[in-house]
């Protein structure tokens, strides 16, 4: 019984860190927006404030890795000290959010990404409980001796897996989207969603009707399109010219760059929610989001031929399943490596 009780704090802390790290890591772009909000409130500028996505990836990977290390039981004393330090920082931050007039301007801490939000009071209570668990865990392992580097392979696997989760989502867009504009979402059912023409008349319903007759490819951009962007879109423009798809640009008022495309406008918050990248495109078929691509890494041709819209929708239809298999495979490798090390492998 005592053995079970000794493992309670590490298991609870590990589960919480894994959940928090993965929920943020599956959408590091959204976490970077929250970090930018913090930097703005704190008045930070320069290198740190200029690279929020990089810090977001580090934060998500760090939380996920710490949770996996707690669950695997390697380097227990070092991990326990690290957990106390992290929870002390998080608790201090949420106390500032809860009681500082400036902190109250931040709507939520972003602990669980876009999956769900907690009020400042609930977040502070959660962190106080987790901090107490971290101190309890440190007390439990205080007398344990150092076992050298045994466990380094498990640690390496945890680090690689934890870094891969946010990096994949940052580059190739979230495979699981908790926002209302994810793959499979009906755009017309999203409250407050609107797209406008050059006269600022709403054309959302008209565009959804167009997508009912043939797929609508909407380029989503928060900046002017470059020559390289237009080159990558040439295959899609050719499909539009052949009448197989409809093609347009959704951007900010005042920006153009359509280069022959119909240009429509919406607000910046909507653009950031539609696509977790500065510029990319989404395929809407029958009013339903079927596929998304980050234009910065999009390859317009494979094996000497252009990638067709139908291929992209088929690929994205099976994306959650493939992603789930990869995650389970990564976890299985970590369990296998940990078991080998526990059996005496070095």
Residue positions per predicted region:
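Functionalized membrane-embedded alpha-helices
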Residues: 3-25, 52-96
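Internal/C-terminal transmembrane anchor helices
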Residues: 147-176
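Short, internal strand/loop/helix patches
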Residues: 247-250, 258-280
